[in-house]
């Protein structure tokens, strides 16, 4: 596998970009997660960033990437509506892993948004998408721009939802390379990694949460529910960061 030209790939239509990356992805599928990170750092352009929602299994990708690339900027888009346990988890992992945390927020405070738009998360799919655009997508776009990112690592896994089932290791999103080192990991592999490195699940894991986002759009798992049904009232899985 050789170095890839981001500018040249960005000039191609999306379908052609996927085809251009197909051979590289076929080879990346044969590598371990650690090897994928090392390959990306050697062959893809900097600056490098890692995004995290500090969700249930966030410690895995944070530890994995940070141990290979210490001080990599870790982007958190903070909506202001995270669980108290999430904010505590962020503090704990930032201290334990010595993370270079970069927090980005919407230009409007949560209270101001509610005054202007009402509770967007109660306004169906359209309201949720507007909420995500304001609180997730715009802050992430700003982060990528301000940090001059050209390669973005994230901890998505195919097993998490139908919308992620066919994602490749390497893609181009928002004009930058996006690398998903643990995309093919199952829950058992995640558990084994956490155990091996003395890491913890999010505190709400023990209370029956399989996925954690904002307090108003996250539900505990109940028998018969798919994991993706625990977010956004089952109306959608993605918050907008990993779409497009």
UniProtKB/Swiss-Prot annotation:
It comes from the Bacteria. It comes from Salmonella heidelberg (strain SL476). It is an enzyme of class 1 (oxidoreductase). The lineage of its organism: Bacteria, Pseudomonadati, Pseudomonadota, Gammaproteobacteria, Enterobacterales. Keywords: Cytoplasm, Oxidoreductase. The active site is at residue 239. Its EC number is 1.8.4.8. One of its GO terms (cellular component) is cytoplasm. GO terms for biological process: hydrogen sulfide biosynthetic process; sulfate assimilation, phosphoadenylyl sulfate reduction by phosphoadenylyl-sulfate reductase (thioredoxin). Belongs to the PAPS reductase family. CysH subfamily. InterPro entries: PAPS/APS_Rdtase, PAPS_reduct_dom, PAPS_reductase_CysH, Rossmann-like_a/b/a_fold. This is Phosphoadenosine 5'-phosphosulfate reductase.
């Amino acid at each position: 596998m050789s170095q890839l030209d981001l500018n040249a790939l960005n000039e191609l239509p999306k379908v052609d970009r996927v085809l251009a990356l197909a051979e590289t992805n076929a080879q990346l599928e044969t590598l371990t997660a650690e090897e994928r990170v090392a390959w990306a750092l050697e062959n893809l352009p900097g600056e490098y960033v890692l995004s995290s929602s500090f969700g249930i299994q966030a410690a895995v990708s944070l530890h994995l990437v940070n141990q290979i690339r210490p001080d990599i900027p870790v982007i958190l888009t903070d909506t202001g509506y995270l669980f108290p346990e999430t904010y505590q988890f962020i503090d704990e992992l930032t201290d334990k892993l010595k993370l270079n945390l970069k927090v980005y927020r919407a230009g409007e405070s949560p209270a101001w948004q509610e005054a202007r738009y009402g509770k967007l998360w109660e306004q169906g799919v359209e309201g949720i998408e507007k909420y995500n655009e304001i609180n997730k997508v715009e802050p992430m776009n700003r982060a990528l721009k301000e940090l001059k990112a050209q390669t973005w690592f994230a901890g998505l896994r195919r097993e998490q939802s139908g919308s992620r089932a066919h994602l490749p290791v390497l893609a181009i999103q928002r004009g930058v390379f996006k690398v998903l080192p643990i995309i093919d990991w199952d829950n058992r592999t995640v558990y084994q990694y956490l155990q091996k490195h003395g890491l913890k699940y999010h505190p709400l894991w023990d209370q029956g949460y399989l996925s954690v986002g904002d307090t108003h759009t996250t539900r505990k798992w109940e028998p018969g529910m798919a994991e993706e049904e625990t977010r956004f009232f089952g109306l959608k899985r993605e918050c907008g960061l990993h779409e497009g």
